[in-house]
Amino acid sequence: MKEYNLNDTHLLQLDSQKDPIALHTEDLHVFYGDNEAIKGVDLQFEKNKITALIGPSGCGKSTYLRSLNRMNDGIANSRVTGKIMYKDVDVNTKEVDVYEMRKRIGMVFQRPNPFSKSIYENITFALKQHGEKDKKKLDEIVETSLKQAALWDQVKDNLNKSALALSGGQQQRLCIARAIAMKPDILLLDEPASALDPISTGTVEETLVNLKDDYTIIIVTHNMQQAARISDYTAFFYMGKVIEYDHTRKIFTRPKIQATEDYVSGHFG
């Protein structure tokens, strides 16, 4: 495969006065033992926008995403250095309450992972764990979350039904509803439609576009068409580094870096 100069990069710098920043990383490195999976990534994520992370398998995009709310903490021999700045706080420090932080920076995984409970209990379980006991308030949160995830009309008459009986696409939207029930500011999604059929994928994409009015969304995807359709910004990862970061339309029509152009045009990956 063609070799690229990894120092040849183009990273858009957002103007925080005009483009409010929800989250940014500074010189972020992620190690698994002696293997450096992420090599000094600086990225800014604009509030209430969708940012897509793209790149070939093994480039580090999912590792980077998981580092943003410290999901890598539970992996043996993993180590993260650098800053993950959220509301002027570096969440990559021992002083941060990780459990509370993950309420603000939620995560939806590649494969739907509903609890083996009812649809209603999937939404309310974490809320109850945090002390919410008011039945009326819980009912309101369930309805609001399911409506935002475009699932309410399909399940409103069967909230006591097992979540495992839902279709794959419905399960993934339930997982999105479960995440937003905690009222996060940021929603991280790791290839949320990769296991779904085209119709379900389209529904999830439409849901995410509608959600950005209330949430900042960062999504890993292997689907170039998906990134082009729904994201405002795109970051191209390659060999643990961000090679190019820009408005999505520029990444897909006028990339500045040869490696980016070769990847989005299908020459490798």
Swiss-Prot record:
Catalytic activity, as annotated: phosphate(out) + ATP + H2O = ADP + 2 phosphate(in) + H(+)
SUPFAM superfamilies given in the database record: P-loop containing nucleoside triphosphate hydrolases
Binding site for ATP: 55-62
Annotated GO MF terms: ATP binding; ATP hydrolysis activity; ATPase-coupled phosphate ion transmembrane transporter activity
EC number(s) reported in the record: 7.3.2.1
Residue stretches making up the ABC transporter domain: 23-264
Region forming the signal peptide: none
Keywords, in A-Z order: ATP-binding, Cell membrane, Membrane, Nucleotide-binding, Phosphate transport, Translocase, Transport
GO CC annotation terms, alphabetical: plasma membrane
Residue ranges the record marks as coiled coil: none
Main localization, broad class: membrane
One GO term of the biological process aspect: phosphate ion transmembrane transport
Keyword Translocase tagged: yes
Keyword Membrane recorded: yes
Subunit-structure text: The complex is composed of two ATP-binding proteins (PstB), two transmembrane proteins (PstC and PstA) and a solute-binding protein (PstS).
Role, per record: Part of the ABC transporter complex PstSACB involved in phosphate import. Responsible for energy coupling to the transport system.
Annotated protein name in UniProt: Phosphate import ATP-binding protein PstB 2
Organism field: Enterococcus faecalis (strain ATCC 700802 / V583)
Gene for this chain: pstB2
